[in-house]
């Protein structure tokens, strides 16, 4: 009997439309590849960080959010968990260099295209 591995994902994103599209992309990618994703949405990074436990395999994080931006949140995340895969989802491509300082695995540019999402996921999940 094959044991199904579930990939636990946190989506830290304040735009509901982006959350819905990311969750659709995860479901679509899972149907295509046989991967199973479980995700939790956090509308802002402070709650995510306050409740953070290293149970996530992957974190999708927006950069521009109120109260705390994604770069600050990523630095705090790395203090708690150095191994979680971190994927920034942003309109701001000029943050790429800073992203490497916090160990970002990938960047997905908004508006999100499924093709871009799938290409990044193929590279991230071996």
Locate each region found by the language model.
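Acidic, metal-coordinating helix/loop segments flanking the phosphotransfer/catalytic sites
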Residues: 38-58
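Alpha-helical elements of the RecA-like P-loop NTPase motor core of helicases
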Residues: 20, 50, 97
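Non-catalytic signal-transmission and effector/linker regions of two-component phosphorelay proteins
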Residues: 1-10, 20
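Two-component/phosphorelay signaling modules centered on CheY-like receiver
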Residues: 15-40
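CheY-like receiver
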Residues: 56-126
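Conserved SAM-binding loop
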Residues: 11, 41, 88-89
